[in-house]
Structures are given as C-alpha cells and as structure tokens.
Amino acid sequence: MMMKFKMKKSVLATALLAATSIPALTAHAGATINFGEDKSISLGFGMRSSFSSVEDGAPNGTSRSQDFSLNSARIYISGSLNKNIKGMLNTEKDIAGEGFQVIDGNVQIQIIPELTIWAGRFLSPSDRANMAGPYYSLGGGYWSGIASRYGFNGGYIGRDDGVAAVGELLDGKLGYSLGAFEGNTAFKIAGLTNQGPLTGSDGLMYAGRLQYDFWDAEPGYYGTGNYLGAKDILAVGIAGRTQNNGAASLTKEGRYSSYSVDFLLEKKDVGPGAVSFEAAYYDYDTDDVFLSEQGKAYSAGAGYIFSEPVGWGKFQPFVRYQKFNSDALTASDIKKYDVGVNYIIEGYNAQVSAIYSDTKVSGTDNKNAFNVALQIQF
C-alpha cells in the first residue's frame, strides 16, 4: 500500500482532531503520514524555554539569580486506526527530577458522536487551567502550583491512569467528562516529606467535569485557557474528584477530595482587539492528613489581544492573580501577582512572553521575578 506523506498545519488534524474535536487553534504544526482512509500517524514536538531573574535567588541568598532553563520538551504522537478509534502518545523531558516520562498514552473510542471513551493515561477531569496546561494558557505558568494545584499535585503532570466517558450535548454547548482513575498520585511532585505508602483499603479516584458554553461552543476534552481573539466565549465549568484513602502520610490515611468552579469570558471586536476575563475558585480537602495541601484557592486574570499585527505577530498584555490559603497552622499562605505581555506569532505554536511576578509567602518578604519565555510547537 502506498503511503502518502504531506506536511500539515496540525499534528493532530487527522488523527486526534477527529477523535477529540480539539479546536484547530490548539493544534500543533507537524507531519502526518497517511496509510489510507482514516488511517494515519502524526508526529510533533513542543518546547518551552525561559530566562529568569529572581530576587534573592542566587546561591548567596542576597543577589538576583540569572538562569536559562528548558522548562518543557515534549514529543507528540497521535494515530488513527479508523474513523472511530484514535490514540495519542505524548512525552515530557522530566517530571520532578524523575527523567523522561510518558504523560499521555491512551486510546479514544467514539461510540456515538456525543460519547467517546478514553482509556489509558491522560488528564483526569479538572479545572480549565489544568485541562489547558502551560502550553494553552494566558501567559502559561499555571504549574506554579498556587491556585490550580492539579498540574503540580496531579501525578504525571495532572495525568492519571484510568477510563472516562467524554462528550458534548446540546449542540456542543454542554461538555461533560466522568471517569475512574488509579489515583494515589495526587501529591506525586508536591515535595511533601511525610508521604507514606497506602496500607488501608484500596479504592479508585472518581473525577468529573461539566461545562456550559453560553456563546460559541468549545469542542474537545483537552481545553484552552484563552482563544486569542478567535472566539466569543462565555463559559462556566465545575469539576470535582474524590478518593477514599487518597491521602496517605507515614502515620495517617484519609479521603482526598476537591472541587472547583471556573469562568471564562472572551469578546471579539472590543475596540482594536479582543478582551478576556477569567476566574476560578478551588476547595481542597485531604481529611486533615496534609494540612499544607488542604485549603481554599482563588485565581483571576484579564487580557487584551490587539487585532493589528506588529511585525510577525500580535501583542497581548495581561494580568493575573493567584492565592492559596492553607489550613496548616505552621504552613504559609501564598499570593502571586503577574503582569506581562505575550507576543503571539502563530497562535500557541509560536509565541514569546515577558512577565514580571511578585510572590508573597506569609511570614516572609515579597520576592519579585522577571521571566522571558519562548514557546514553539512543531
């Protein structure tokens, strides 16, 4: 059988787009090999690299740090067996010092247009920020683990092993996802020193999300944090998860549960561009096992993207606020403010960001930081 090789604007266009209805805005540039009708393999690559300067971040504790970092490097592979069976395999260069890992390895089986079964390793249902991740968020950086703690405290960067029912109803306006997962990885990279092995009863983690789009529908399971002026969005989402004995220390085990509510508004043609507002509320409960990871969190952000290009791309200034209130008496509350600007060259495939941040941990002095990041996806 002859294989036809051609370059496409999306590494997921044939193999993954059909399965998950991920909008073209979030797709990668890449290459697709077609084997026949509805049979293909696609390959892509993404990376985020940055320069940062952090107050008192140098080894002497009093000077500013000056560091270049490769924050993320991913290989994207997706495939299509037929019009109803698709799959993906995505990797990350490193997770919490544990080296190269598979973050997504799953198959998607479309039962009917309104229902697709996901099985394997993938993002379990959660808030918009975690479903979008650092590559598809307003300015990136949700992995700071302040408000949206799923990406930071969610196993394989927010992923888990399990199965979920995913789909859209009401002409795509109502999105739903509900699944069962292995769990017990909620604090995999949290840096807790007193985590212990599970010795009590075993139980799965159950997670779900509902989202309603009042204006333009948002197709797809893996989401987008900002549509960069491409859509009119008014959306509200709720998510929750729970697992018996999902929090285990060296001396105690308890139920892990959390829920969140998130909101996104984007409007095109507001003056010379498009405006966006986002907000979210989180409640985390570890059954008093890890009080430092138990509490309430808040986030809010706003952005404005200019329609007229300047040189290669468009400017998008933005602001963001995050706060986590811990229940621990000895732990600290955290607040972070970001002010920045994105230079959008080709959607989420090519952009540069410059961000000034101020972080306040209760009981300590404020720490400011300046970060310039480059994101490229092929």
Label the model's feature ranges.
Residues 1-32:
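Cleavable N-terminal export/targeting peptides
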Residues 4, 32, 36, 61-62, ...:
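Outer-membrane beta-barrel pore domains
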Residues 23, 98, 186, 361-362:
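A short hydrophobic/aromatic micro-motif that marks alpha-helical segments and, especially, helix-coil
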Residues 30-186, 200-218, 224-229, 294-308, ...:
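Outer membrane beta-barrel
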Residues 69, 112-114, 142-146, 189-192, ...:
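Glycine-rich loops and low-complexity Gly/Arg-rich segments
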Residues 177-179, 187-195, 220-221, 248-250:
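A short secondary-structure junction signal
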Residues 195-201, 254:
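Interfacial loop-to-helix transition and helix-capping segments at the boundaries
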Residues 218-221, 273-275:
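Short, structured loop/turn "capping" segments at alpha-beta junctions
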